[in-house]
Amino acid sequence: MNREITYEDLNKLNYCGAIIKEVSRLMPTVSVLFRVSAKPDEIAGYKFLANTQFFINVPAIQMHPSHWNQPEKFDPDRFMDSEQQIPKNALLHFGGGARVCMGKQLAILQLKALMVLLYRKYDVELMDMSGGIKYSSTVVNHCEELPVKIKVKHSA
């Protein structure tokens, strides 16, 4: 397929969307979300005053076994199964609630387009399938090294 990719095409790529969610679940872009309580509240027996600062540990939520079956396993299919309920706020790859990232839908479309354009013209393989990914885990996480082999696909 050599034609231009359309918005409609990208919206049909459900498995690409599942891959994006699963990669983001296992390796979130941010490790911590910050929130401030608007009013006094009680959660699980603990009382919090208004203006209490909360630091939300994103990897802990996204890897918690009460939210995910086999949380350490890369499994995009977990997002394809309409029967499997993902608990609210168990996936925070773009934040959540009133402060969810405004660019979420655009970013997902761009990632899908990147996947299509890359894999349309190239074969991409990890150099070491058993090796881990070298990344820096700070407030904003990023990959430091990921050796890959890229080959141009030849047209038939």
Model-derived segments and spans:
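C-terminal helix/juxtamembrane-tail motif
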Residues: 53, 138-156
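Hydrophobic, repeat-rich solenoid/adaptor surfaces of innate immune receptors and signaling proteins
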Residues: 58, 111, 148-150
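Cytochrome P450 heme-binding "Cys pocket" and the immediately downstream C-terminal segment
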Residues: 80, 87, 104-141
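Conserved cytochrome P450 K-helix/beta-meander segment immediately N-terminal to the heme-binding cysteine loop
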Residues: 10, 56-83
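Conserved cytochrome P450 K-helix E-x-x-R motif and the immediately C-terminal K′/meander segment
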Residues: 2-44, 65
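Conserved, non-catalytic sequence blocks in retroelement Pol enzymes and Pol-derived host proteins
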Residues: 6-14, 45, 99-105, 136-138
